[in-house]
Amino acid sequence: YLRKWLLFQYTDKVVSWTLLAVYLGTNMLYYTFHEGNMSHIYNFCFASVLLYITQTWHTKPTLYKAILLGIMGGMLTLIRPINILMALVFLLYNVVDRRTATQKLNMLWQYKHHLLAAVVAAFIIGFPQLLYWKHVTGQWLFYSYTNERFFFTHPRLLEGFFSYRKGWLLYTPIM
């Protein structure tokens, strides 16, 4: 679906080389064949579908596409709760200035029933997880990364980029 989305903007040759570079120049190959139980590939897959459906909905809005957007958003949020921010991709798609922001708000208002359907679809996808958390922890929302935290006052940018342990640029040089 990433290919289909990229073909809206670029030639087939450019898209093919780009996808090859992403596949070989990032951790995608490793996570595809060696760590298939990790969430990364599923996250990439659902995000790619979300991008494609976002483009097609903006080209020709239909209720079916809106429901698919909700399903993709729900699945992305299940994979990683922070992925709920992917909704911003849909909401801000092609917004570049105040004029396009106003046009987008008008479009979203015109298709508010599509937005409602997307939210309901996402909720239906996510509700079993909420029930599970309620049953197991007694809370509707549960933060499962209890030992993880952010270090905003002491960022380790150089280590994050170049460390041999988890260096972003070391293991994904194409970036």
Segments (PLM) and residue ranges:
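Membrane-interfacial entry segments at the cytosolic side of transmembrane helices
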Residues: 63-65, 103-120
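Membrane-lumen/periplasm interface segments of specific transmembrane helices
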Residues: 89, 93, 112-175
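Structural signal for the C-terminal ends of transmembrane alpha-helices
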Residues: 7-10, 53-59, 92-102
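Transmembrane-helix signature of polytopic, membrane-embedded enzymes
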Residues: 2-26, 45, 60-68
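Specific aromatic-rich, kink-prone transmembrane helix
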Residues: 42-73, 89-90
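Membrane-interface alpha helices of multi-pass inner-membrane proteins
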Residues: 19, 65-80, 87-91, 123-124
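Alpha-helical membrane-protein architecture signal
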Residues: 30, 64-72, 153-161
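Aromatic- and kink-enriched transmembrane "portal" helix at the membrane-lumen/periplasm boundary
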Residues: 19-49, 53, 74, 78-83
